Amino acid sequence: IVNSIEHSVNRHIHPGVGIAFSIVQNNPISLAFPRHEDGTLSTLANKFIKEAKQDETLKDLTQILTSYSDKFSVADSKRLSDLAETRLPTYKKSFESAGEKYNIDWHLLAAMAYQESHWDHKAISPTGVRGLMMLTLTTAKEMEISNRLDPFQSIEGGSKYLAKLRSIMDPDIIEPDRTLMALAAYNVGRGHLEDARILASRDGKDDRKWTTIREYLPLLSRKKFYSTVTHGYARGNEPVRYVDNILYYQQFLKLQTMTSTGNDNFSNQDSNSNKKWQDSIPPTI
């Protein structure tokens, strides 16, 4: 039994599982805490939820989480799963190393590469970008990458560039918005991202939030709006789809990692340790 949000997010990692029937409609979600706890955890949880509702953090996180989960089919998930088994293992350690070096979740870097090239290190676009992370020649030179078709150089260059974009964001933009805007800038260019922020600010909207900027980026394809900003026309829908896709791929890869790790841990436990673990569960949970 799962709630609708959990099903929406996790259905891709288990594409063979479907909805049998609904038990209730739109009931609130509750958190259960063991009776023997001293109240510290439940107090902090209630405090966080209250504050997150007041400053709309909860709303923003929910929108980010659900913005991509319904846009992908079982076929999309199957293709991603297949390539995650056949292509990703070759590059996994490089993604992990780059993630540690630049303080970026390696699943996110791997998701970027899947979005850019489907983990094809020979990928070449008609626009001139190429390689696993689809670097432009200018970006490759800036990141000191000599061979864009070398997958390991490409991972280094793309990771370094994303880290740079994230570092030069306005200091009042915090996570996760900081990384999400850096992703959009990686796709459409920082200048167009800043133009979208200007449009949002003119309307009195919070230009530090990705949930705001994703609504204004598409306006850059309309002359009424792009003619009033510095960097002009942009296909503003593309960076929105780009970020949504990467978030989906990242979530899929993280769930896949968790599932794999969980299965490994379970298989290594003997019956006695399982018995002890079960006996330790408070009867109130």
Residue ranges and their predicted role:
Residues 27-70, 88-89, 240-243, 249-256:
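Extended ligand-binding regions for polar small-molecule ligands
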Residues 8-47, 73-76, 221-222:
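Periplasmic-binding protein-like
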Residues 22, 30-33, 43-44, 180-252:
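Catalytic and substrate-binding regions of cell-wall glycan-acting enzymes that process beta-1,4-linked
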Residues 1-8, 105-106, 110, 136:
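Beta->alpha turn/N-cap motifs
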